[in-house]
Amino acid sequence: MRRHLLPVVSLLVLLLLVRQLYPYVSGSDPSIVDGYEVNLVSENLGGPTCLVWANDTHLLVCDRDGGRITELNIETDARRTLLDGLHHPHGLLLHEGKAIVSEQGQLSSYLIAEDGLFVDGQTLVSGIPAGNHQTNSVNVMPNGTLIWHSGSTCNVCDEADERNAALLWVNATTGEHGVLASGVRNSFDGVWVEDHGYFFTDNGRDWEGDHPPEELNFLIADAAYGWPDDEPETPVPEGSEAPVGRWTPHTSMNGVDLRPVHSSLPGLSPSEGFTLYTAVYGSWNTLLPKGHE
């Protein structure tokens, strides 16, 4: 019996080895749509987790690893630190003359000085637990209320703090806040689309094969979005909202933005609708590893 099992075990080991080597032997050159090209704008920026335009030439970058916000001149590659001493910054919003900064477990508001530095910080919200994930992007609704994306502390569990695995609303002045949507395992970002509403990404559980797909969701206030009850047999649990878009499981659909009407990038015309672009991180937890998309 053992002799018969040996070829099977050997084959499984070989397949496992091929899977691990696949990212190295499959090549790292990006596949690009005809008529477009990929250019290096800058490098050595630490662990970039957000990109926000300050103006036509200056790009603000959240450096998760360095704990800072960096200003980058894309024409000269000159850079300077606008704010440091942060704990894993993941989000930045420029709003009404202030910089709203999301870091691990905390949301703060800073005045923007004449020289562009972020000063006189005021903590809006603190004490959000972190674990497998943390608090991510911060955006603003048309009425001025902030939307803060808060990840789960685990892969699959019942959270002790309802502010985890949720979208939170936050008053930009007082810091008053609450849960806007629940059952959102790890939503990294969202975008407001005029005449439609707020669309947001959400990344599902790991270590369960190619299940579940990553999600693009449409925000309905006070709605639940399924986690942690979204089993393979019940991908959309009763009483929860289904996604409006899906992507490869475990690849982390993170940043999302609206394609400008006059953009040269592929997309729908205004008469046809609108187009969203997302940044996909990639994963080795898929059946075949996937790179950035």
Q: What does each of the following model-derived ranges do?
A:
Residues 38-43, 78-84, 122-128, 176-181, ...:
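A short beta-strand motif characteristic of beta-propeller blades
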Residues 72-77, 112-116, 171-175, 219-222:
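Short loop/turn segments that connect beta-strands within beta-propeller blades
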Residues 1-23:
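Secretory targeting signatures
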Residues 60-75:
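Beta-propeller domains
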Residues 24-32, 135, 152-156, 165-175, ...:
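Beta-propeller domain segments
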Residues 60-62, 101-102, 147-149, 199-202, ...:
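Residue position within the beta-strands of beta-propeller blades
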Residues 105-141, 149-152:
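Asp-box/WD-like beta-propeller blade repeats and closely related beta-sheet repeat scaffolds
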Residues 44-57, 85-104, 128-145, 182-197, ...:
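Beta-rich, blade/repeat-based domains predominating
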